[in-house]
Amino acid sequence: MTHDLQQKSKLSAVEKIKAKSRYLRGTIQEGLADLATGAVVEEDTKLLKFHGTYQQDDRDLRTERMRQKLEPAYSFMVRVRMPGGVCMPKQWLQLDELARKYANNSLRITTRQTFQFHSVVKRHLRSTIAGINEALLSTIAACGDVNRNVVCHNNPYLSPLHKTVYEWSKRLSNHFLPQTQAYHEIWMGKEKVAGTLPENEEPIYGETYLPRKFKIGITIPPNNEIDVFSQDLGLIAIAKGSRLVGFNICVGGGMGMTHSEPSTYPRLGDVIGFCTPSQLLEVAENILKIQRDFGNRCDRKQARLKYTIDSRSIDWFKAELNQRLGWDLEPARPFHFESNGDHFGWVEDSKGRWHLTLFLLSGRIKDTLDQPLMTGLREIAKIHKGDFRLTTNQNLTIANISKTNKPRIEALLEKYRIPMPERFSPIRQHAMSCVALPSCGLAMAESERMLPGFLARLEAVVEKAGLADEPITLRVTGCPNGCSRPYISEIALVGKSLGRYNLYLGAGFAGQRLNKLYRESLTEDEIIATLSPLFEHYARERQQGEHFGDFVVRAGYVDEVRAGREFHEVRSEKAVQSA
């Protein structure tokens, strides 16, 4: 592989850990058995990600535990691999039980169309992951330097085309699944065959896997709910009528960056061509292998595919791909996107089956005094004969409901006070957040916990400006890594320090343009005060059909970002103001 040419002395610490891990085994077994601590050793925390779990600690308790001379309150986040976001009712009930037995009595829908469990302590980690597998699901490759959960349009019942695209998400997921037996040995108690390990347990990945995570998503125009341009490999389904004819190939998207390091930036993917369905696996595998072979293994901040492309060129990438394929991609086919949000409420398909998409703020499923959401969805799962579909916007579709079962589900929604989505404002429906504090070790500020209160204040300002019915995308993240895909949101708050956020404006409503830093290190009060006159200006002078993100660019509040490397550029006469 080309990365072998990189000087081994300069390889990142994680690369060295992977190389000696014996295909992700490390000393995880020994660490799980050591109950004298709630943690595992540092090297194994890197390997556990490939198994679908992150070691964390409760940051709300850090200071007090330090004062008491106790180790941090360690726990683990466990993420499910669920291509296309499909969950059957029986699986829902099994995951619900695991969350109540081993986690923090909640489930969280992620921005990659799957579930996360939080606050799983080490002594329950094996039981939790084994339980997920007993539900015929898995956690392998939900995290780590591999292909992550493959996302696609959330409802395959809407048309034959949607069903075909969903099937492709499963095929891609299975094709790039790690082959190591370490997962089954550690979590399901499979005995390792005596003797040495196979010479190569990973025919696609190799012993050091990828330089960084790799994300694949499929979308069907005109909806871009998966934010296809944010994917390492984005696939835009091209159809004639309801028949899939192929995919436009989009490469090099990614959200993460680091504050004050302009060499790191979000990037939207480039559309480089078109392939037929029969060519897709070959194309996808070779794109992943180019990243495997040429991705930066010395600096993890430069290790995503977006930097591999920008450090050489998109023309180099296309030439390398065509050379490996032995043939050229066809020219990309025309397409058009209208939005990157979900379509809420009841929808009836051509076969008379019903589908209901619910709005779930931040994807959090838990019981509160005002709304026993987790209990209500559990009761629905007990009678539901269809399935559940998770969306990449952290919402939930109860899918494939028969005409006779629809009234029963409606009755349960009312009984457990689960509101219909039309009760929520458009800006709330288009809002997302990451988890952030107290569990995420990278968070610099609140996100999920601050969003409800902030949204209420923002809704009042929007309503005062006469924009209560205007859809505007809002995303909040506790750090610049961008798990809620903030840099393709019309308004984005990115945590800078506790209680302070960088304010970004100007992304495209359909996720087709990056936003730009407008103000730095603002408090919530300052953000509200900053946005209020912009909303009033927008209400007065917007053009017919003009979205807020387009307006702030046209009005000159921020410059249009045409490429990721322009993201940090600031015109001298529009220098970013610090609070």
Swiss-Prot record:
One GO term describing the cellular component: sulfite reductase complex (NADPH)
Required cofactor(s): siroheme; [4Fe-4S] cluster
Molecular function (Gene Ontology), one example: NADP binding
Gene assigned in the entry: cysI
Keyword Heme attributed: yes
Note accompanying the cofactor annotation: Binds 1 siroheme per subunit. Binds 1 [4Fe-4S] cluster per subunit.
Alphabetized InterPro entries for the sequence: CysI, NiRdtase/SiRdtase_haem-b_fer, Nit/Sulf_reduc_fer-like_dom_sf, NO2/SO3_Rdtase_4Fe4S_dom, NO2/SO3_Rdtase_4Fe4S_prot, NO2/SO3_Rdtase_4Fe4S_sf, NO2/SO3_Rdtase_FeS/sirohaem_BS
One GO term of the biological process aspect: cysteine biosynthetic process
Pfam families: NIR_SIR (PF01077), NIR_SIR_ferr (PF03460)
Top-rank lineage group of the source organism: Bacteria
Database matches in SUPFAM superfamilies: Nitrite and sulphite reductase 4Fe-4S domain-like, Nitrite/Sulfite reductase N-terminal domain-like
Subunit structure and binding partners: Alpha(8)-beta(8). The alpha component is a flavoprotein, the beta component is a hemoprotein.
Source organism per UniProt: Nitrosococcus oceani (strain ATCC 19707 / BCRC 17464 / JCM 30415 / NCIMB 11848 / C-107)
Name the record gives this protein: Sulfite reductase [NADPH] hemoprotein beta-component
Annotated metabolic or biological route of this protein: Sulfur metabolism; hydrogen sulfide biosynthesis; hydrogen sulfide from sulfite (NADPH route): step 1/1
